[in-house]
Amino acid sequence: MTITPATHAISINPATGEQLSVLPWAGADDIENALQLAAAGFRDWRETNIDYRAEKLRDIGKALRARSEEMAQMITREMGKPINQARAEVAKSANLCDWYAEHGPAMLKAEPTLVENQQAVIEYRPLGTILAIMPWNFPLWQVMRGAVPIILAGNGYLLKHAPNVMGCAQLIAQVFKDAGIPQGVYGWLNADNDGVSQMIKDSRIAAVTVTGSVRAGAAIGAQAGAALKKCVLELGGSDPFIVLNDADLELAVKAAVAGRYQNTGQVCAAAKRFIIEEGIASAFTERFVAAAAALKMGDPRDEENTLGPMARFDLRDELHHQVEKTLAQGARLLLGGEKMAGAGNYYLPTVLANVTPEMTAFREEMFGPVAAITIAKDAEHALELANNSEFGLSATIFTTDETRARQMAARLECGGVFINGYCASDARVAFGGVKKSGFGRELSHFGLHEFCNIQTVWKDRI
């Protein structure tokens, strides 16, 4: 049999080019079997009590910690994340289980209220099996931050993972099995686009959650909408990182480098468009370029390296094409702009200056280790530039004037604002975007309630 991306998911080590695994796409029988298991699993799971489900979350966290190094090594091998960052992803995911186990049950408690002397109760009921289409850039965290609250709420979770991280998908499934989660409550299968469409249409899928590109999210969202099924979309971002003249320069540069080059720049909610007030622009740019140049790129298994390869060669080629287009449009190259010689999908840390709003690096998401610097005349101009985007995931403001920062935050068109810090996600607070960055929220009680039937029960209303 000829193996091609049309017939199989192919996982390739991005650091070496070595083929890691090959898995055929799920056929109609595989999909039907998965849906049958999911339907049966949900029927039983929804009847379990919340304390039992919370305890199972703790078991998932324990099972994940027991396989922590195995999981981290798999993440690094399949998508090139530097090993220390992969270990941090595993630890964060295990902690998420504990947090929802401790706090989630209270968030799902019935809420009684009086309405004109009549008793009413808001109940949080499960919806059914949720189809989750997840990306490769945080192959564990993205799955866990959806699966954990979804399962706690009494739903089932059916994963379609990115084809280049099938080893991660298999290992995550093993973690849930180790924790005693029934197969039909947590499941996964290697579905292609046609398989995804088939599942969305099926009545045994209650809702869909997607993390991915705008193009993929729009296509899947349209299918979910046609089936009148709820959909949560966490899509791309081109986050502005605003530095005003009164900012703490050293702190801003440190955060800028971390915010742009974490995970080799392959993060949806990450600093991408650096909007710098002109009075501090020269000093910021000089220090930022020096700090980016000092980053160590190489084998992601080496703990000394902070930059690894990009996850796929086609993504590296697309990024390089975006850089070349931006330079042809008049931007100035201050650092990098080249593929690293030798094996692997490495792209050197890159800094572009004199970037203006009509250029590619400003208009499009740069999903890799490329920073685009734009000069703002003043704070008002910085806000205008920041909002001049089809994306609205998150934003950063660096200034020592907290009052002004909060005033600016209120006018930024995005789902999250970071004042004197860089983008992060945490179980305790909501995460999501606006505009073409998607809709719906993950994490906190908002993420827990997204996939609940919020049911009002009236008593003795005549």
Please give the residue ranges for each predicted region:
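Structural signal for hydrophobic packing residues in well-ordered secondary-structure cores
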Residues: F42, R46, G61-S68, A72, ...
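ALDH superfamily catalytic-core signature
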Residues: R215-T356, I419
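Rossmann-like NAD(P) dinucleotide-binding subdomain of oxidoreductase/dehydrogenase enzymes
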Residues: K109-L251, A376
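N-terminal Rossmann-like NAD(P)+-binding subdomain of aldehyde/semialdehyde dehydrogenases
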Residues: M1-Q118
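Conserved C-terminal structural/oligomerization subdomain of aldehyde/semialdehyde dehydrogenase
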Residues: T16-V22, I205, I242, K296-M297, ...
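Residue-level signal for inorganic ion chemistry
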Residues: G17, R53, I75, C97, ...
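Short, well-ordered beta-strand elements within core beta-sheets of diverse protein domains
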Residues: Q19-A26, G41-E47, A132, F241-L244, ...
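Short loop/turn microsegments at loop-to-beta-strand junctions
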Residues: A6-A9, A271, L393
